[in-house]
């Protein structure tokens, strides 16, 4: 009998610890162990891996990660009610589960890795998922401390992460992701898989960081994409005026049609614009402010 067989069913755990999902924390619990195993396997072979999990809740995905061979799981949980349930899993897998009670937006996990390369696997709380992803993709220095991100999002958000030009979902999030990583949707998850069921379909995505992304200052890319997509219906010669430099000069330098709109420009085009903007403001290309 394996350690996971010694643990009570998740529904019993939820009942025993009074773990009704809290909307304020963006909680939707996954109880189907076949599904949690599928999510865990989506990150690749787990034997010997160090995994960071955000928002484990009662520990359905945590169990799967450990049962599939993760050497160590570092679980960051904000909800104090869930800690006792996670401690039960830790007891079943001695020395392999470290529980950090805290807000993942504020916790620096790197000191807990002991120099090991880690991957992130998580059913992210819906209310902070995008903010967490942006933080991870903005990591400095780069390459980052993680080798991959396997994450659950609302389907609409997942589409915004992986979108390409000429689509309604394409925007700032897709440009940031495409600059620093390669992302794809692995599969969808129906609302009925969760307790309580959300109103929308969810998707699991897999993100692999690029070892050497095009040099660019993050702050310049953020300003350019904010200006361009903030007025996405306007031509770039108009929308980029808010940058405080001559937009026609930027577009001419980068060879981009001045009548183009934001959704028509690929990631490489935005990186070229950001670097041209950096030079125009006197910051250079890929300077220390987030390069």
Curated annotation (Swiss-Prot):
Gene Ontology CC terms, in alphabetical order: cytosol
Pfam families linked to this entry: RrnaAD (PF00398)
Transport recorded as keyword: no
Catalyzed reactions per annotation: adenosine(1518)/adenosine(1519) in 16S rRNA + 4 S-adenosyl-L-methionine = N(6)-dimethyladenosine(1518)/N(6)-dimethyladenosine(1519) in 16S rRNA + 4 S-adenosyl-L-homocysteine + 4 H(+)
Broad class of where this protein is predominantly found: cytoplasm
Major enzyme class: transferase
Protein name, UniProt field: Ribosomal RNA small subunit methyltransferase A
Gene it is expressed from: rsmA
């Amino acid at each position: 009998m394996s350690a996971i067989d010694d643990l009570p069913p998740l529904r019993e755990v939820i009942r025993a610890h009074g773990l009704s999902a809290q909307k304020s924390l963006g909680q939707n619990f996954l109880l189907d162990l076949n599904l949690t195993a599928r999510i865990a396997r989506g990150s690749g072979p787990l034997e010997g891996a160090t995994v960071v999990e955000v928002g484990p809740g009662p520990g359905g995905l945590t169990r799967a990660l450990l049962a599939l061979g993760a050497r160590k799981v570092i679980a960051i949980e904000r909800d104090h009610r869930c800690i006792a349930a996670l401690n039960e899993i830790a007891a079943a897998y001695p020395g392999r589960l470290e529980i950090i009670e805290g807000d993942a937006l504020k916790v620096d996990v790197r000191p807990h890795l002991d120099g090991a390369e880690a991957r992130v696997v998580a059913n992210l709380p819906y209310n902070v998922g995008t903010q967490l992803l942006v933080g991870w993709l903005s990591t400095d220095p780069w390459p980052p401390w993680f080798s991959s991100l396997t994450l659950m999002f609302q389907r609409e958000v997942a589409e915004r992460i992986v979108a390409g030009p000429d689509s309604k979902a394409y925007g700032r999030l897709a440009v940031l992701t495409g600059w620093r990583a390669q992302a794809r949707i692995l599969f969808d998850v129906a609302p009925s898989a969760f307790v309580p069921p959300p109103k929308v379909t969810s998707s699991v995505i897999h993100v692999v960081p690029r070892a050497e992304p095009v040099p660019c200052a993050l702050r310049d890319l953020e300003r350019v994409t904010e200006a361009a997509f903030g007025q996405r219906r306007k031509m770039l010669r108009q929308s980029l005026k808010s940058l405080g430099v001559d937009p026609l000069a930027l577009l001419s330098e980068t060879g981009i049609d001045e009548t183009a709109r934001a959704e028509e420009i690929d990631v490489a085009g935005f990186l070229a614009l950001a670097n041209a903007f950096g030079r125009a403001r006197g910051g250079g290309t890929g300077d220390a402010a987030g390069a």
